[in-house]
A protein has these predicted regions:
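Glycine-rich active-site loop/strand segments that organize a redox cofactor
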Residues: 55-57
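Short, flexible active-site loops
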Residues: 25-31, 59-68
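FAD-site-proximal beta/loop scaffold in flavoenzymes
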Residues: 1-51
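Flexible, glycine-rich terminal cap/loop adjacent to redox cofactors
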Residues: 50-53, 62, 67-159
Length: 159
């Protein structure tokens, strides 16, 4: 079985290794090493091999987090990655206070940044720092995966 320089099993898009009868998913490969990713890869492999419904995983829409204080969450492209890949981008930043902090009289704030493809208005990245950022970014990943437009965000009534 062929390995990468770091010792991971090399696989193709169907999770097949260099030996046709050996497949690999999860942390033994050189893809994103997160439990939910390994589970999704296992489902995709089983569906393709045994269920007759091949599916792919969009590795570009997997949220990531740093569980620090304050926590950080991100999904999609950074501003720099978007500029390199797409050319012109727009960014929008804002801070806000979660309702639980408003009601408690606390001044804890979060900062978020949207990265938008200038040509299509598509939100290609969302980044956040502040309380509950990782949990919030899990839901935001749906917006990036669904290729929502900045106009969709603007048209949404906030709580």
């Amino acid at each position: 079985v062929e390995l990468t320089e770091r010792g991971a099993i090399k696989v193709d898009n169907d999770y097949r290794s260099s030996v046709p009868s050996i497949f690999a998913v999860g942390d033994v490969t050189d893809r994103i090493q997160l439990t939910p990713v390994a589970i999704r890869e296992g489902h995709a492999f089983a569906d393709a091999q045994f269920g007759g419904s091949p599916r792919t995983i969009d590795y570009g829409c997997i949220p990531s987090a740093v569980f620090s204080h304050p926590p950080i969450g991100a999904v999609g492209l950074t501003e720099s990655q978007a500029k390199n890949r797409l050319g012109m981008v727009r960014t929008y930043t804002s801070d806000f206070r979660a309702m639980k902090y408003v009601l408690a009289g606390r001044n804890e704030r979060s900062l978020y940044k949207l990265v938008v493809d200038d040509a299509t208005d598509e939100v290609v990245g969302i980044h956040m720092i502040g309380p509950d950022a990782p949990e919030i970014l899990q839901a935001a990943a749906i917006a990036v995966r669904a290729r929502l437009k900045k106009a969709d965000f603007d048209a949404t009534v906030a709580l």
